[in-house]
Amino acid sequence: MSNMEDRILSNTVRNEDYEIEGGLRPKFLNDYIGQDKVKERMKIFIEAALHRNEALDHVLLYGPPGLGKTTLSNIIANEMNVNIKITSGPVIERAGDLAAILTNLSENDVLFIDEIHRINRTVEEVLYPAMEDYALDIIIGKGPSARSIRLDLPKFTLIGATTRAGLLTGPLRDRFGVIAKLELYDTEQLKEIIRRSAYILNVYIDDNGAKEIASRSRGTPRIANRLLKRVRDFAQVRGDGRITLEIAQEALELLEIDLLGLDNTDKKMIETMIHNFGGGPVGLDTLAAATGEERNTIEDVYEPYLLQIGFINRTPRGRIVLEKAYNHFNIPFQK
């Protein structure tokens, strides 16, 4: 059984994140840090839609967890000055569930569906005319006497979010007019996010302390805000409440998060690949069985960051460990 949800470095949502993120989320694009190319495009699309007094075209946001897909969706609704309805793919079990949501939307509203790749195929087919024609096809009756009626819907914007864009069907993906990939953040962007969050939380943090937390946050704002909260606890109990470089280092060492933001779970993953499979190539299913992690967890949670920092590579034959990872964990590298 995976203990991924218990990790402080997990980029999936934990209960505490709702409390943290709720008060820290920016409300408008000008306050949204990072993802500059996506922001620039969205500003143009939003301004054009407002100028024409139309609903924004449907938007697909994809990328690793914790990068701000939900936040960006709320911002889009705020910028368009409309309401947002939030749901997720697994929650919409029947076509009737989706119909109830769609018929309760107002003109130009935003419907945000998280994990849209997990939506039921029957439900997905109801989405097609809703997205294309702003209409809902309903079957009345059964058997030979069954007939279809079409209900007009208010014009709306569907924002779909996914960590697995490759799992979307072609017909669904093709109905999104705007497709945007959210990238992992760099240290400077995360430092800015941490400074902003600390200000909102009324916590003093110096530049070096913010940079130290940022450098160990795996390129992910959700993790950065979570670590900030943990370091704040440490500063209040072991210090004077101020977060300095020294306090940040002590707190993160206590949490067993190394200089690159890796923990014992990452170390186990890399060491398993090296010691059990000679550094690879090793298939994803084999690696999942050897580490006790889910295949999807490895692909969505661990791999994006390990790929970004140059510790592993994906090949047609499987995953391989690169020399940089051997050096980091002090394991002799053999070509």
Swiss-Prot record:
<keyword id="KW-0547">Nucleotide-binding</keyword>
<dbReference type="GO" id="GO:0016887">
    <property type="term" value="F:ATP hydrolysis activity"/>
</dbReference>
<dbReference type="InterPro" id="IPR003593">
    <property type="entry name" value="AAA+_ATPase"/>
</dbReference>
<feature type="binding site">
    <location>
        <position position="66"/>
    </location>
    <ligand>
        <name>ATP</name>
    </ligand>
</feature>
<dbReference type="GO" id="GO:0006281">
    <property type="term" value="P:DNA repair"/>
</dbReference>
<keyword id="KW-0234">DNA repair</keyword>
<keyword id="KW-0233">DNA recombination</keyword>
<keyword id="KW-0227">DNA damage</keyword>
<dbReference type="InterPro" id="IPR041445">
    <property type="entry name" value="AAA_lid_4"/>
</dbReference>
<dbReference type="GO" id="GO:0005524">
    <property type="term" value="F:ATP binding"/>
</dbReference>
<dbReference type="Pfam" id="PF17864">
    <property type="entry name" value="AAA_lid_4"/>
</dbReference>
<dbReference type="GO" id="GO:0000400">
    <property type="term" value="F:four-way junction DNA binding"/>
</dbReference>
<comment type="function">
    <text>The RuvA-RuvB-RuvC complex processes Holliday junction (HJ) DNA during genetic recombination and DNA repair, while the RuvA-RuvB complex plays an important role in the rescue of blocked DNA replication forks via replication fork reversal (RFR). RuvA specifically binds to HJ cruciform DNA, conferring on it an open structure. The RuvB hexamer acts as an ATP-dependent pump, pulling dsDNA into and through the RuvAB complex. RuvB forms 2 homohexamers on either side of HJ DNA bound by 1 or 2 RuvA tetramers; 4 subunits per hexamer contact DNA at a time.</text>
</comment>
<feature type="binding site">
    <location>
        <position position="24"/>
    </location>
    <ligand>
        <name>ATP</name>
    </ligand>
</feature>
<feature type="binding site">
    <location>
        <position position="25"/>
    </location>
    <ligand>
        <name>ATP</name>
    </ligand>
</feature>
<comment type="subunit">
    <text>Homohexamer. Forms an RuvA(8)-RuvB(12)-Holliday junction (HJ) complex. HJ DNA is sandwiched between 2 RuvA tetramers; dsDNA enters through RuvA and exits via RuvB. An RuvB hexamer assembles on each DNA strand where it exits the tetramer. Each RuvB hexamer is contacted by two RuvA subunits (via domain III) on 2 adjacent RuvB subunits; this complex drives branch migration. In the full resolvosome a probable DNA-RuvA(4)-RuvB(12)-RuvC(2) complex forms which resolves the HJ.</text>
</comment>
<comment type="similarity">
    <text>Belongs to the RuvB family.</text>
</comment>
<dbReference type="InterPro" id="IPR008824">
    <property type="entry name" value="RuvB-like_N"/>
</dbReference>
<feature type="binding site">
    <location>
        <begin position="132"/>
        <end position="134"/>
    </location>
    <ligand>
        <name>ATP</name>
    </ligand>
</feature>
<dbReference type="GO" id="GO:0009378">
    <property type="term" value="F:four-way junction helicase activity"/>
</dbReference>
<feature type="region of interest" description="Small ATPAse domain (RuvB-S)">
    <location>
        <begin position="186"/>
        <end position="256"/>
    </location>
</feature>
<dbReference type="Pfam" id="PF05496">
    <property type="entry name" value="RuvB_N"/>
</dbReference>
<feature type="binding site">
    <location>
        <position position="314"/>
    </location>
    <ligand>
        <name>DNA</name>
    </ligand>
</feature>
<keyword id="KW-0963">Cytoplasm</keyword>
<dbReference type="InterPro" id="IPR004605">
    <property type="entry name" value="DNA_helicase_Holl-junc_RuvB"/>
</dbReference>
<keyword id="KW-0238">DNA-binding</keyword>
<dbReference type="GO" id="GO:0048476">
    <property type="term" value="C:Holliday junction resolvase complex"/>
</dbReference>
<feature type="binding site">
    <location>
        <position position="319"/>
    </location>
    <ligand>
        <name>DNA</name>
    </ligand>
</feature>
<feature type="binding site">
    <location>
        <position position="222"/>
    </location>
    <ligand>
        <name>ATP</name>
    </ligand>
</feature>
<dbReference type="GO" id="GO:0006310">
    <property type="term" value="P:DNA recombination"/>
</dbReference>
<feature type="binding site">
    <location>
        <position position="175"/>
    </location>
    <ligand>
        <name>ATP</name>
    </ligand>
</feature>
<dbReference type="InterPro" id="IPR008823">
    <property type="entry name" value="RuvB_C"/>
</dbReference>
<feature type="binding site">
    <location>
        <position position="185"/>
    </location>
    <ligand>
        <name>ATP</name>
    </ligand>
</feature>
<feature type="region of interest" description="Head domain (RuvB-H)">
    <location>
        <begin position="259"/>
        <end position="335"/>
    </location>
</feature>
<feature type="binding site">
    <location>
        <position position="70"/>
    </location>
    <ligand>
        <name>Mg(2+)</name>
    </ligand>
</feature>
<feature type="binding site">
    <location>
        <position position="295"/>
    </location>
    <ligand>
        <name>DNA</name>
    </ligand>
</feature>
<feature type="binding site">
    <location>
        <position position="70"/>
    </location>
    <ligand>
        <name>ATP</name>
    </ligand>
</feature>
<keyword id="KW-0067">ATP-binding</keyword>
<dbReference type="InterPro" id="IPR036388">
    <property type="entry name" value="WH-like_DNA-bd_sf"/>
</dbReference>
<feature type="binding site">
    <location>
        <position position="71"/>
    </location>
    <ligand>
        <name>ATP</name>
    </ligand>
</feature>
<dbReference type="GO" id="GO:0005737">
    <property type="term" value="C:cytoplasm"/>
</dbReference>
<keyword id="KW-0378">Hydrolase</keyword>
